[in-house]
Amino acid sequence: MGKIGIFFGTDSGNAEAIAEKISKAIGNAEVIDVAKASKEQFNGFTKVILVAPTAGAGDLQTDWEDFLGTLEASDFANKTIGLVGLGDQDTYSETFAEGIFHIYEKAKAGKVVGQTPTDGYHFEASKAVEGGKFVGLVIDEDNQDDLTDERIAKWVEQVKGSFA
């Protein structure tokens, strides 16, 4: 398995903590803050995991917004991509975890892996749901932090083969 680039953007530190947990679980990964990342660095990986919190009512976190603006769909074309979104299903029930939707729109030019069921979450709507599943792993550190480690472990097992 080639080295995996785990890119995150964060305001509160939650996304960085999740990126570190995923790195520990999956192994052979480099964790990179998108606030300090370059397009060249991103393009140095063929396997990436993108960890993005949702800002406000369905927006992409600012560092991610800036970094994503430097990337084209073609930058994702030959990559295997796992998406991890953070959100608050109670406060933002109608736009839950939509931050990863904005990344997914470009990332789907590559091979996106790791879609997960919406079971166990309580929300009204989310653009991050396609075909009845989330486009990646979704974490709610505000309301279901007790499920985070289990969700990460299951997701890593699910995607490990795709990153081999």
UniProtKB/Swiss-Prot annotation:
PROSITE patterns: FLAVODOXIN_LIKE
Flavodoxin-like domain mapped to chain residues: 4-160
Listed cofactors: FMN
Keywords assigned: Electron transport, Flavoprotein, FMN, Transport
Domain of life (superkingdom): Bacteria
One Pfam family it belongs to: Flavodoxin_1
GO molecular function: FMN binding
PANTHER family, per the entry: FLAVODOXIN 1, FLAVODOXIN 2
Entry function: Low-potential electron donor to a number of redox enzymes.
Family membership noted in the UniProt record: Belongs to the flavodoxin family.
Protein's name in the database: Flavodoxin
Species annotation: Helicobacter pylori (strain J99 / ATCC 700824) (Campylobacter pylori J99)
